[in-house]
């Protein structure tokens, strides 16, 4: 949870949590690819994966330049929507990765997402300018991961979902870093 603390600390904590989750998602994606997806299929699927991400339907910024045009509150809202869209499906990850070294902590991914959700909500409360009143967070979600790893369709579905998970967490990490840099102007700001 996020106790009362300075805004700079709230941002620092949220960025660290987002970085950790993005790294975990990237490692999991790579491990899944290495374990289940034949080399010749890896590149042919990349194009179809990007089209199937739910997050593509959200009018969220897609790049750094686009994100720089948005207010901090808008970026926090987009981040919250992205995080919340994964809360349900991520609970099925541990069943998919029963023997995984990377996802040995998969049961904790849900808790880590909830922590990040709380951190983003704490930032939203701190920055609240009245625009949150009446703001209804939609709770659309991704499909659940398929635990049948003997089925090629299920493998490709999970591969696509992991790709989306990685991309979405990268977006959240980027948005949070951008806001932190904008607010606190650190000289070593790299996004």
Swiss-Prot record:
<keyword id="KW-1015">Disulfide bond</keyword>
<keyword id="KW-0372">Hormone</keyword>
<dbReference type="GO" id="GO:0005131">
    <property type="term" value="F:growth hormone receptor binding"/>
</dbReference>
<dbReference type="GO" id="GO:0048513">
    <property type="term" value="P:animal organ development"/>
</dbReference>
<dbReference type="InterPro" id="IPR018116">
    <property type="entry name" value="Somatotropin_CS"/>
</dbReference>
<protein>
    <recommendedName>
        <fullName>Somatotropin</fullName>
    </recommendedName>
</protein>
<keyword id="KW-0862">Zinc</keyword>
<dbReference type="GO" id="GO:0005615">
    <property type="term" value="C:extracellular space"/>
</dbReference>
<dbReference type="InterPro" id="IPR001400">
    <property type="entry name" value="Somatotropin/Prolactin"/>
</dbReference>
<feature type="disulfide bond">
    <location>
        <begin position="53"/>
        <end position="164"/>
    </location>
</feature>
<dbReference type="GO" id="GO:0046427">
    <property type="term" value="P:positive regulation of receptor signaling pathway via JAK-STAT"/>
</dbReference>
<dbReference type="InterPro" id="IPR009079">
    <property type="entry name" value="4_helix_cytokine-like_core"/>
</dbReference>
<comment type="function">
    <text>Growth hormone plays an important role in growth control and is involved in the regulation of several anabolic processes. Implicated as an osmoregulatory substance important for seawater adaptation.</text>
</comment>
<feature type="disulfide bond">
    <location>
        <begin position="181"/>
        <end position="189"/>
    </location>
</feature>
<dbReference type="GO" id="GO:0008083">
    <property type="term" value="F:growth factor activity"/>
</dbReference>
<keyword id="KW-0964">Secreted</keyword>
<dbReference type="InterPro" id="IPR034975">
    <property type="entry name" value="Somatotropin"/>
</dbReference>
<dbReference type="GO" id="GO:0045927">
    <property type="term" value="P:positive regulation of growth"/>
</dbReference>
<comment type="similarity">
    <text>Belongs to the somatotropin/prolactin family.</text>
</comment>
<feature type="binding site">
    <location>
        <position position="173"/>
    </location>
    <ligand>
        <name>Zn(2+)</name>
    </ligand>
</feature>
<dbReference type="GO" id="GO:0060396">
    <property type="term" value="P:growth hormone receptor signaling pathway"/>
</dbReference>
<feature type="binding site">
    <location>
        <position position="20"/>
    </location>
    <ligand>
        <name>Zn(2+)</name>
    </ligand>
</feature>
<dbReference type="Pfam" id="PF00103">
    <property type="entry name" value="Hormone_1"/>
</dbReference>
<dbReference type="GO" id="GO:0031667">
    <property type="term" value="P:response to nutrient levels"/>
</dbReference>
<dbReference type="GO" id="GO:0005179">
    <property type="term" value="F:hormone activity"/>
</dbReference>
<keyword id="KW-0479">Metal-binding</keyword>
<dbReference type="GO" id="GO:0046872">
    <property type="term" value="F:metal ion binding"/>
</dbReference>
